[in-house]
Amino acid sequence: MSQKYLFIDRDGTLISEPPSDFQVDHFDKLAFEPEVIPVLLKLQKAGFKLVMITNQDGLGTQSFPQADFDGPHNLMMQIFTSQGVCFDEVLICPHLPADDCDCRKPKVKLVERYLAEQAMDSANSYVIGDRATDIQLADNMGITGLRYHRETLNWTMIGEQLTKRDRYAHVVRNTKETQIDVSVWLDREGNSKINTGVGFFDHMLDQIATHGGFRMEITVKGDLYIDDHHTVEDTGLALGEALKLALGDKRGICRFGFVLPMDECLARCALDISGRPHLEYKAEFTYQRVGDLSTEMIEHFFRSLSYTMGVTLHLKTKGKNDHHRVESLFKAFGRTLRQAIRVEGDTLPSSKGVL
């Protein structure tokens, strides 16, 4: 999985920039911006790696001797490290604007390797800085820029903005039998739109979203003139893939979930977002169809979903009414999924360090 990065300016963003000469060249000029350390710790826990990138005009010249820079800078780095803030890299351009070098922000020379390796999660990486050149650097890198300001966008605000979840995924799956478009928003509720061409199946999918506490949009065009097999199976595959993508790095999720009574039915659902696909399914139906949905395809749907989502899923229901039995399975799965995808912290719920 690609890595989230924060490319952070130094003077005026991490530490205060002296208005007199814009140089932190003495220990008494070193002052940290408010809340910078606790917020950076929070962002590290959320999965971001930190890269410092700074223009230091004339560094190493008579007007800004290297030794004058090194003392305060090294102390700053020692303080960051002592508090658990770790920068993967510190990138410095020492040139003056008149030098017309190729490494001065907003040029991308210093960050070329992050762009070339394609290991950066561009959609979730940011440049943070107090100047227009920082925002221009972000534009040149194809990522988002955040203009730091103590009043309008301070470190507390940045921390809240970057750790607020809005987990989303979009999957398109086209085969000779089906054309499927699935969008999932795990942190939004309501207004789900589902059209598979199988009315009862639409109703069941809506139960997953409603009881799962999330929103999804599913559009399917399938070979229903034959039967509902490909439509149901491929929808399960596409939805499972979308849920897996929306979960992202899975940090902070509860991972596990559980049981649901419905009228005369008792449905049991146990779920582990483990990365290991497996289904145990036990349900018997009196009739071959409920509405326009084949009852034999219900197990096939959950098997397809568990395979692409990478989950261990146990489903079981008992009852007297086929409609209720089917609905209890989808409701129980939705309710269990609601528990499992809920974010309660920022650590990965696995002793292995991977899910």
Curated annotation (Swiss-Prot):
Annotated EC: 3.1.3.15, 4.2.1.19
Segments for region (Imidazoleglycerol-phosphate dehydratase): 167-355
Segments passing through the bilayer: none
Catalytic activity: D-erythro-1-(imidazol-4-yl)glycerol 3-phosphate = 3-(imidazol-4-yl)-2-oxopropyl phosphate + H2O; L-histidinol phosphate + H2O = L-histidinol + phosphate
Key word Glycoprotein present: no
GO MF entries: histidinol-phosphatase activity; imidazoleglycerol-phosphate dehydratase activity; metal ion binding
Cofactor: Mg(2+); Zn(2+)
GO cellular component, one term: cytoplasm
Lineage: superkingdom: Bacteria
GO biological process: L-histidine biosynthetic process
Annotated metabolic or biological route of this protein: Amino-acid biosynthesis; L-histidine biosynthesis; L-histidine from 5-phospho-alpha-D-ribose 1-diphosphate: step 6/9; Amino-acid biosynthesis; L-histidine biosynthesis; L-histidine from 5-phospho-alpha-D-ribose 1-diphosphate: step 8/9
Subcellular location(s) per record: Cytoplasm
Location of region: Histidinol-phosphatase: 1-166
Protein's name in the database: Histidine biosynthesis bifunctional protein HisB
Organism listed in the record: Salmonella typhi
